[in-house]
Structure formats: structure tokens, C-alpha cells
């Protein structure tokens, strides 16, 4: 998750002092991006599900917008105090895609590595070329990204969030909980013997 997030920020060229809007910020990759943005000295704003706002603030989000808000551009503008968004790190896709492009400042950068709300979107090319936006797809990280992540962990700049640990024999329950999306971070499935050793 952190490797994917680091590559997204690297491809978008996120720099210290810039503002980044993170969708899906309570998930494994999204929560990683919030922390990775802070580690770079950037200012992360987040979109997360209802009831998860405080957890996302606790990992470093400047402000959290509740997913499903009626007017996303207005909510982001209010959250930033009218300051522009330099980068959108989108893990959701779907119906909010065009709003995310409208939220970006001229010459802003959009990066994606997910489409949980839907992979097919409509793009008004005028939005892209009149604002001179950069659109980046990202699916995997590099060794250099991995080395930065290890350094951030050693420096205690990031801390992976574990939303739950399940025995392999409880995989069905882990999948059910994953689909319910009632957690923040990642769910971990371990072999029964490892879980039994940890419990004992």
C-alpha cells in the first residue's frame, strides 16, 4: 500500500508546502498517502467515509471532507480556506472524477492507482487542456520508492495502520469485514500457527 502511494506522489512530483487532496483516505493506500505526503512536507487534505474522520486527522490530514458531500468543490475550498489544490491522489474514480479535476489549480497534477467507485469516467478535454493539467496513472513502485519508505519508517515519519488481524481460517470473516469498509488502514491475514503463537 505504501509503495503504491509513494509512487503516486513521486509521479505527481509532490513537493514540500504543496496541498494534496487524497480520496479513499481511510483505506490502506489512502492512509499511507496522507502520512507520506506529511513526510514530504506537503499538506494533505482527505476525503473519507463518515465516522472515519478523526482517525484520518490523527494520521496527519489537515482537514477531512466526508465522502458523499453534495458539493465537493465547495467543501474542499472551505477546508483549504480558499487555497488551491496542487495534486489530487485519487483511489476512487467514478462520479467524482470531474469534480476532482475542477478542484485542481491550473497546471495541477492528478494521479490515480484505483477506481473502487468505477473505472469508466467522462473527461471534458477542455478542463484538461485549458487548465494545462497533468494526468498520471500509477500501479507499482520502484526500489527507490521502497528505500524512501524504509527511511520514513526508521525516522518514525510513517506508521502503517492495521485495521484488524485475522487467522487464515477466518478469511471469510476478513473478506466480509473488508467489503463492509468499517475499518481504517489495512486488514492483515496470517497463518493460524502465527496467530496462535502471537496469542499464546
Stretch-by-stretch model annotation:
Residues 17, 61, 84-85, 158, ...:
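Local beta-strand N-terminus motif with an aromatic residue
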Residues 143-200:
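C-terminal hydrophobic helical "lid"/dimerization subdomain
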Residues 15, 105, 182:
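Short conserved AdoMet
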Residues 48-57, 120-125, 147:
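Short, glycine/polar-rich helix-capping loops at beta-to-alpha or helix-loop-helix junctions
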Residues 21, 45, 109-111, 136, ...:
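Structural detector of well-ordered beta-strand residues that form the stable sheet scaffold
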Residues 106-113, 122-164:
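Rossmann-fold dehydrogenase core element
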Residues 58, 62-132, 195-199:
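Glycine-rich cofactor phosphate-binding loops and adjacent beta1-alpha1 units
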Residues 1-70:
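Mid-domain Rossmann-like dinucleotide-binding core that forms the NAD(H)/NADP(H) cofactor-binding site
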Amino acid at each position: 500500500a505504501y509503495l503504491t502511494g509513494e509512487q503516486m506522489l513521486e509521479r505527481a512530483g509532490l513537493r514540500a508546502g504543496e496541498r494534496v487532496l487524497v480520496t479513499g483516505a481511510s483505506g490502506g493506500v489512502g492512509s499511507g498517502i496522507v502520512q507520506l505526503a506529511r513526510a514530504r512536507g506537503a499538506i494533505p487534505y482527505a476525503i473519507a467515509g463518515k465516522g472515519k474522520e478523526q482517525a484520518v486527522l490523527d494520521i496527519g490530514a489537515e482537514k477531512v471532507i466526508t465522502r458523499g458531500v453534495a458539493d465537493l468543490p465547495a467543501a474542499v475550498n472551505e477546508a483549504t480556506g480558499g487555497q488551491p489544490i496542487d495534486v489530487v491522489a485519487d483511489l476512487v474514480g467514478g462520479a467524482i472524477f470531474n469534480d476532482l479535476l475542477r478542484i485542481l489549480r491550473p497546471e495541477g497534477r492528478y494521479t490515480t492507482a484505483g477506481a473502487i467507485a468505477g473505472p469508466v469516467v467522462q473527461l471534458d478535454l477542455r478542463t484538461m487542456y485549458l487548465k494545462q493539467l497533468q494526468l498520471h496513472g500509477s500501479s507499482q513502485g520502484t526500489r527507490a520508492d521502497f528505500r524512501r519508505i524504509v527511511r520514513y519508517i526508521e525516522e518514525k515519519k510513517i506508521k502503517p495502520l492495521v485495521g484488524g488481524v485475522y487467522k487464515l481460517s477466518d478469511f471469510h470473516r476478513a473478506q466480509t469485514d473488508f467489503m463492509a469498509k468499517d475499518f481504517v488502514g489495512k486488514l492483515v491475514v496470517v497463518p493460524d500457527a502465527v496467530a496462535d503463537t502471537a496469542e499464546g
